[in-house]
Amino acid sequence: MADLPQKVSNLSINNKENGGDGGKSSYVPPHLRSRGKPSFERSTPKQEDKVTGGDFFRRAGRQTGNNGGFFGFSKERNGGTSANYNRGGSSNYKSSGNRWVNGKHIPGPKNAKLEAELFGVHEDPDYHSSGIKFDNYDDIPVDASGKDVPEPILDFSSPPLDELLMENIKLASFTKPTPVQKYSIPIVTKGRDLMACAQTGSGKTGGFLFPLFTELFRSGPSPVPEKAQSFYSRKGYPSALVLAPTRELATQIFEEARKFTYRSWVRPCVVYGGAPIGNQMREVDRGCDLLVATPGRLNDLLERGKVSLANIKYLVLDEADRMLDMGFEPQIRHIVEECDMPSVENRQTLMFSATFPVDIQHLARDFLDNYIFLSVGRVGSTSENITQRILYVDDMDKKSALLDLLSAEHKGLTLIFVETKRMADQLTDFLIMQNFKATAIHGDRTQAERERALSAFKANVADILVATAVAARGLDIPNVTHVINYDLPSDIDDYVHRIGRTGRAGNTGVATSFFNSNNQNIVKGLMEILNEANQEVPTFLSDLSRQNSRGGRTRGGGGFFNSRNNGSRDYRKHGGNGSFGSTRPRNTGTSNWGSIGGGFRNDNEKNGYGNSNASWW
């Protein structure tokens, strides 16, 4: 992969050595440049290798065994926990060998098969991992502000972490905490609320799961309220709730939770839209100690009386900015302020976000109490461990240029972003016809198809994933070595999030983007990002930047280097109202910042609980 930048450095059709004339000539693939007339002939795959897009999804689906798009796992798949709950709330709690007896946590027996499923087998030739280069985290800046900020930890140790959790962390091959984990673990174990500004890929999931599980393992299950349910009307009483904007992110958090609750009494569950709600209700009814949910589906379960939030000790809002961007603020406020969740003083609240604009600051002021603000520098999004290449390619030449890239060096997993669902399907079929193992994910796919596609990609059954913006944020696929922006987004923030899918966990990666005249609105933003990460700036991009500057053109997309950049600071220190620990009066009604019909996204018509037909629900 290190040679890829050199191999593709001459792909720009502005390069006159390749027959270009400053951007006007048609793109000529390298393997045809010696011929008189450029043409492109599609190779014909062997009959035994020919797979249509639909066939590939069905083949990938047989690899996963998901139940109707919902992770309805057996007791073994859930780390050994089963439904042997003592619903009366006594001191004895048993779950398939994992027990809480007389105030003591007794871990369950080891299960070699389940360990291999959860943590992988490193000796297996089909096991693919680029590893976590923890040393690359050492220079990441961290700023913590607030009253009495605890000292950060330097390594995983007990205390503060639980001994069983330490064993599971070791099984996951985590050797030392990332910067966000060094600070968040002592903050949460000290009982403080937390507002953390951290990018996806910084280890933030472990940053809230590790201390949360430590406290749950030590404190045990909460008793179910007396007369709260009868035999004919059962209800889930989770101790911890994690809200996430998309079903993809929710399932990823759930999968991580399965790892770190292995052999414990804690049983995680996940609920989200687009999957049969009956299956999810049955899973919750079997026992749910940690609930990972999207706001729309959780509101549905609350309305049906299948979930109670009365026992919530820990509330986590992951990718809070994304949830507000998607219009989820009314649903979130309904869950937190209008249901039976304990008040802010009687629960611990953790909020994680890549950015903290004003609306997120307001949400934190309402939901958090005397919180600590944590700002962690970027890991992977625009850092030097990602080699960024911007190639000038007209729309009509993109398929040829893509084949050049994939033929130059195609190792590991490649994630290709396109702007439309139709293009995702068309490009996937095109790649399959060229004998590439490709699959796609976008909003028009059923939930079962999306899960099968992701499972096939993660397992390297398909090593190319074509995706729309639904996969631009939150997806945690650690082995992606190459991100290709087949279509560049119109917002520079989206570019940052997309290329952050590679170079994860301190690893190196390559991000290649096809640029043409349709993308001039993000020229300034691209220049800033490339310069910030010490990347080579193409000549054509510099020329366009100078032309736009003379013409008074402003950078499109806004946000990242303007108003949103201010959100990475603690507003209590930088012009905010009040001092550390101050809170404004709690909002007891409907949000004043957005209508019930859509929060901050007026272009989406939906009711206060979300549109069940929306692809993001």
Curated annotation (Swiss-Prot):
Q: Name one Pfam family in it.
A: DEAD
Species classification: Eukaryota, Fungi, Dikarya, Ascomycota, Saccharomycotina
Region Disordered, annotated ranges: 1-90, 542-617
One Gene Ontology cellular component annotation held by this UniProt entry: cytoplasm
UniProt-annotated location(s): Cytoplasm
Write down the chemical reaction(s) this protein catalyses.
Answer: ATP + H2O = ADP + phosphate + H(+)
Motif, Q motif: chain positions: 154-182
Briefly, what is this protein's role?
ATP-binding RNA helicase involved in translation initiation. Remodels RNA in response to ADP and ATP concentrations by facilitating disruption, but also formation of RNA duplexes. Redundant to DED1, may be required in conditions in which DED1 expression is decreased.
Q: Which SUPFAM superfamilies match?
A: P-loop containing nucleoside triphosphate hydrolases
A GO molecular function for this record?
ATP hydrolysis activity
SMART domains per the UniProt record, alphabetical: DEXDc, HELICc
Regions of compositional bias (Polar residues) in chain numbering? 7-17, 79-90, 580-594
UniProt comment concerning the protein's domains = The Q motif is unique to and characteristic of the DEAD box family of RNA helicases and controls ATP binding and hydrolysis.
| Primary site of residence | cytoplasm
Q: Which gene encodes it?
A: DBP1
Give start and end of each Helicase C-terminal domain: 385-545
Entry-linked PROSITE patterns: DEAD_ATP_HELICASE, HELICASE_ATP_BIND_1, HELICASE_CTER, Q_MOTIF
Which UniProt keywords are present, listed alphabetically?
ATP-binding, Cytoplasm, Helicase, Hydrolase, Initiation factor, Nucleotide-binding, Protein biosynthesis, RNA-binding
* Protein name, per record: ATP-dependent RNA helicase DBP1
The top EC class, named as a word, is: hydrolase
Task: Tell me which residues make up the Helicase ATP-binding domain.
Answer: 185-374
Q: Which organism is it from?
A: Saccharomyces cerevisiae (strain YJM789)
Q: Which family does the UniProt entry place this protein in?
A: Belongs to the DEAD box helicase family. DDX3/DED1 subfamily.
